[in-house]
Regions:
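N-terminal cap/leader regions of alpha/beta-hydrolase-fold enzymes
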Residues: 1-251
Length: 251
């Protein structure tokens, strides 16, 4: 499980979270429920966060924003209340990243996602979409490969094997695939972005494929970007808009 420095950097956003915490299948989830509008209650967007987890206000506000757009959204706390703390974004912070990594590998955290999916199915949910950010993309892609989910969006994905994971996705998944990419991203660099276009583009992936590109943005922009930078603000807002449109089109 590898990371880049930008995985741990960013800006904490301001706002007042409107969602609520629920325990689903024994796992804490931050839930955004649409208010004042009709929405499908049997279709769920799984919000799969970066390393700062659902405790980070940025992630909570994004869940709320999806709900405001009529999408019932569950942010899964697959770090079991132990994400990397928000103050680890501060320069000079000495948080033990390596120690945290050892305790939160895929094999340890993926069962939490599966438990939430199983519990929601028992409640009558029939379709799932995912929006995965950085760390969360490494759940979104396998879920699509296993055809557990019906539509996928990822933003500045990390921990993917390129081209292997992309080729497998293209060959077996039925979930339309959106990638929000950016100019500076050590985890999904220009070479990986181009490879994705070769694998999925030009109609090769029948369910649907699109890759958005946001110049002037770095890895993490869609969650922790500095909104005082006009290009980063445009990137964050653009990635959110494209994700909402993609999820609404296919879920």
């Amino acid at each position: 499980m590898s990371f880049c420095d930008e995985c741990f950097k960013g800006v904490t956003h301001e706002g007042t979270p409107k969602g609520k915490w629920e325990k689903i299948g024994g796992i804490d989830c931050y839930v955004g429920i649409p208010s004042g509008i009709e929405y499908p209650k049997d279709k769920i967007l799984l919000f799969l966060s970066d390393v700062f987890g659902m405790q980070l206000i940025n992630n909570q506000l994004l869940v709320d924003d999806f709900a405001d757009n009529g999408i019932l959204t569950y942010g899964v706390d697959y770090f079991f209340g132990e994400p990397i703390p928000a103050d680890a974004m501060q320069p000079g912070n000495t948080f033990d990243r390596d120690g945290w990594r050892e305790k939160h590998g895929y094999e340890i955290t993926r069962p939490a996602v599966d438990a939430v999916v199983a519990a929601l199915k028992e409640k009558g949910v029939v379709a799932f979409g995912t929006t995965g950010y950085c760390f969360g993309a490494a759940y979104a892609v396998p879920l699509a490969i296993e055809n557990v989910t019906q539509v996928t969006a990822v933003s500045h994905p990390s921990r993917l094997k390129v081209p292997e994971d992309l080729e497998k996705y293209c060959s077996v998944s039925k979930a339309p695939f959106l990638i929000n990419s950016c100019e500076e991203d050590a985890m999904f660099p220009a070479e990986a972005q181009a490879k994705a276009d070769v694998i999925f583009g030009d109609g090769k992936f029948a369910p649907g494929y699109r890759r958005e590109y946001f110049p002037g943005c770095k890895h993490g922009f869609a969650v922790r970007g500095d909104m005082s930078d006009p290009m980063v603000k445009a990137g964050k807002e653009g990635a959110f808009k494209s994700t909402v449109e993609w999820i609404k089109k296919y879920l």
